[in-house]
Amino acid sequence: MSRKYFGTDGIRGRVGEFPITPDFVLKLGWAVGMAFRRQGNCRVLIGKDTRSSGYMFESAFEAGLSASGADTLLLGPMPTPGIAYLTRTFHAEAGVVISASHNPHDDNGIKFFSGQGTKLPDDVELMIEELLDAPMTVVESARLGKVSRINDAAGRYIEFCKSSVPTSTDFNGLKVVLDCANGATYKIAPNVFRELGAEVTVLAASPNGLNINDKCGSTHLDGLQAAVIEHHADLGIAFDGDGDRVMMVDHTGAIVDGDELLFLIARDMQESGRLQGGVVGTLMSNLGLELALQDLHIPFVRAKVGDRYVMAELLARNWMLGGENSGHIVCCQNTTTGDAIIAALQVLMALKRRGQTLAEARQGIRKCPQVLINVRFKGESDPLEHPSVKEASARVTEQMGGRGRVLLRKSGTEPLVRVMVEGDEEATVRAHAEQLAKIVSEVCA
């Protein structure tokens, strides 16, 4: 059944434009409270990133929960995976994240976790949508939900992150640059790595409500690359605004993306006897990852794009590790969703066990040339269903002769068509991608 409000990862949009408005978020809080109160008493955790609009939407959502009779626990600024973890440990019925992830400050969104710290099942999302279209009612005064704040939320999550590596772990002598994207990891990540012994230089850790992801973080790596070289660091780690994506930079300033990080963790887990089953990637995962894992006899399957689909595939197969090239990495032995800090720690442990630099360790995977072009579109029609787009995609696929892949898909979080072409010769791949993007752009116009 199609959804009216929910995308692939909650509800997201421009602040002040429907549905990211205070009145809608108030109604959403009420609908969530009503949905979960059907199971009895209800407590909901709310966390957010550092956007200035987060305070407005936190208050609105909290008011809606109270009107439904649900209690609220406020976490303040907290990485998305931290909210998932605390939802589990506090035995809450649900967790709420107010964030637009890697998007700029003038976007925001609401996404949810179940009491188990996983993304909401489809039937619960559909129930919330039905309630959103129903008249809002308020419980009697004596049954209004209560609100309290968890003051030690950051400390709890810091200790949880540290517990994901052996207690004997000591990164003494390791020089690391962290880019916190002026987002939700700005206090937590530096403390985690320093408490584990690393020498840490921190970038983009002064949020002002407007500078989240602004020329920093996992989608803007120039500053991190320069800082790693300037400080003669061993590596750099970049998080996105809500702390569920991670990218790295080696000591030469070369970018190490999610596919490569996933390979490093998988190889280490195999070598240490901790890998259960295989690895789940997505339709966007580089062919080089699949081939590198194949060389290690590690099974690999592709899920739809989105960490919720990666997680669903992991659960269905009872596997432990999956991720996306964007840096969402799920380590099921530790987490129930993509966790940037914990994924980075697993990579550092892999390097430590092998006695290698990041530049040396990444040589185990040879990525195939891949070009991704985003084309913005407006309107309700699906540009991917247009005959000229279908014909062009089929033509390029035929021209590549089985030596590459073509993938056209709509983003689940932004009004974009993603045009991806992958093959064994970069110039050819780029030419094909630009040709397809031009046709998609003409259709969208």
Curated annotation (Swiss-Prot):
InterPro entries named among the record's database cross-references: A-D-PHexomutase_a/b/a-I, A-D-PHexomutase_a/b/a-I/II/III, A-D-PHexomutase_a/b/a-II, A-D-PHexomutase_a/b/a-III, A-D-PHexomutase_C, A-D-PHexomutase_C_sf, A-D-PHexomutase_CS, Alpha-D-phosphohexomutase_SF
EC class name: isomerase
Catalysed reaction, written as an equation: alpha-D-glucosamine 1-phosphate = D-glucosamine 6-phosphate
Cofactor note: Binds 1 Mg(2+) ion per subunit.
GO cellular component assignments: cytosol
GO BP annotation list: carbohydrate metabolic process; peptidoglycan biosynthetic process; UDP-N-acetylglucosamine biosynthetic process
Keywords per UniProt: Isomerase, Magnesium, Metal-binding, Phosphoprotein
Pfam families the UniProt entry points to: PGM_PMM_I (PF02878), PGM_PMM_II (PF02879), PGM_PMM_III (PF02880), PGM_PMM_IV (PF00408)
Residue positions, PTM Phosphoserine: 101
Its EC number(s): 5.4.2.10
Active-site residues per Swiss-Prot or TrEMBL entry: 101 (phosphoserine intermediate)
Positions annotated to bind Mg(2+): 101, 240, 242, 244
Mod. after translation: Activated by phosphorylation.
The keyword Protein biosynthesis is assigned to this record: no
SUPFAM superfamilies attached to this UniProt entry: Phosphoglucomutase, C-terminal domain (SSF55957), Phosphoglucomutase, first 3 domains (SSF53738)
Needed co-factor(s): Mg(2+)
Gene Ontology MF terms: magnesium ion binding; phosphoglucosamine mutase activity; phosphomannomutase activity
CDD domains for this protein: GlmM (cd05802)
Family to which the UniProt record says this protein belongs: Belongs to the phosphohexose mutase family.
HAMAP family reported in the protein's UniProt record: GlmM_B (MF_01554_B)
Purpose of the protein: Catalyzes the conversion of glucosamine-6-phosphate to glucosamine-1-phosphate.
Protein's name in the database: Phosphoglucosamine mutase
